[in-house]
């Protein structure tokens, strides 16, 4: 699945929040598992994002099978060339209207070896976010 809301909460312990619609088929799976992995997508992952979000008409099982997932250090599905991978435990769940807010304590972080553009979803469209390159003076 893809989510449109991920935010940092705390740096000690490293915690982020993820918002997920309670009607999502993934909701009971994530909550029941108690763990999740956040794959931060690169600009070239728009097709992957569309597929995992269900925008292509494929069934959930087919969507997952189409991506070359690896098993991360914490046992969750990881996109091998993601910009960053955050694996962690759901330590708190709060209901807020149509969504659950899942607080995830990060147990493992993996960063890509090279810098690339990021991918964001805004205004019902995907957008590439240019990677900034720091130039030495």
What is each stretch, according to the model?
Residues 1-137:
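Basic, polyanion-binding surface patches
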